[in-house]
Amino acid sequence: MKSINVLLRPMLKGGMGLLFLVLMLAACDAKKGKTQVEDTDEVVEVNDTTVYGVCGEGTSMHSLEIITDAGDTLVYTLLSQDAETEVETPSDVQGGLMAGDKMAVTGHKTADELVADRVINVTSLLGHWTSIDKNFTIEEGGTVRSAVKAETNPWTSWKILNGSLLLNRDTFAIDGLSADSLYLENANGIFTFKRQK
């Protein structure tokens, strides 16, 4: 401490030196108080409530028979919005119901039945999709292949999780899925894709 006094003595004769000393001490205290934030890539597992399986031949307009990947046969009621019934939330079916197609279903249980909230025809989702800036193929097994070599952040993987489509880390609601079009929505907007044949 004595050596600091010797060095700062000429500066302390004027008021400027005192100000400099106070600022130096304050800066040292500020550095001590800072804590470093650790960057971790910790993955949090999310419980997936989706039931996966194959659409059964017992499927009709108002019921979905699904043979689950575990081998169980479940029957979900499909609620529709029509003038005669007062359904608050109709079942959202995307991609159609075709016996033998792979399906992903989220739903809930009432007192006497299973009710489908969202049904995604995974077989219809597979294929080559294009838009103005995207050109990709959703393949079985969770792989996405991009046909645009210069794309900055191409999607490379996909999965259905709790009724939503995950492309890499981007989560989308499927607003529409048909034989020739796919509408995906997230916080950034609605994205339209056409099927490439």
Listing of model-derived features with the role each one plays in the protein:
Residues 24-27:
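C-terminal motif of bacterial Sec signal peptides marking the signal peptidase cleavage site
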Residues 18-22:
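Alpha-helical transmembrane segments
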Residues 3-16:
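Bacterial N-terminal signal peptides that target proteins for export
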Residues 29-197:
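Lipid interaction determinants
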